[in-house]
Amino acid sequence: QRQMCIRDRTYTDKISRNGLRVGDILHNFEQKYAEAKARHEQILKGLNYEYDLTEIEKAWMEGIEYLKQFPLVDSEHEINNLLNDNKSVLCEGAQGTMLDIDFGSYPFVTSSNTICAGACTGLGVAPNKIGEVYGIFKAYCTRVGAGPFPTELFDKTGDQICTLGHEFGSVTGRKRRCGWIDLVALKYAIMVDGVTKLIMMKSDVLDSFETIKACVASVSY
């Protein structure tokens, strides 16, 4: 929960145009950092939140000094130059379509765009540079934390999927919510992502099940 609050606060700074950017470490960084720190301390004061930044701030400043040894570039130019030279660019993202800040199951979403178009807005890559879009999905559904989950299983079947699929959080070890595949959500993801090819994973998890169910329609109330 604490990690989520910190991440959300960082995105808030970005949208409010108050965030620190990598390029800032080369120009008046101390002043910009002090101003940002003062803003956040005012927020924490209003929440009556006790904190001690000494150790965290020390480690963070060491990280800033470490970054200074590397050349800084405008990533959008760097990536597009590589693409223009017919080079391959591997971009790493996280989280699925339904956690997208704009098109996911709001408000139970993350703070960024997780759909395919997020690669364009996040990297400065034009939409016409994207060719095939591979949609990767599990043979069943999982979810971490709160939010709608129409096919969630609360019985031993859900526990069995969780155990066989090793569905536990990679960081916290928290058990993931498990359920049957939601084809309505999958069809929606295909639409907003512009998927051209589908790849199903973890189908072997369901090998021992005599019956496999799927959600094929939903009703809004």
Q: Where are the predicted features?
A:
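Internal, well-ordered alpha/beta segment that forms a basic, Gly-enriched binding/recognition surface
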Residues: R7-K14
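Short acidic, glycine/serine/threonine-rich loops at helix termini
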Residues: I15-G19, D100-G104, V109-S111, V144-F149, ...
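Gly/Ser/Thr-rich active-site loops/lids in small-molecule metabolic enzymes
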Residues: D24-Q31, I101, S105-Y134
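N-terminal leader/propeptide and maturation segments of large enzyme subunits in energy/redox metabolism
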Residues: D24-Y66
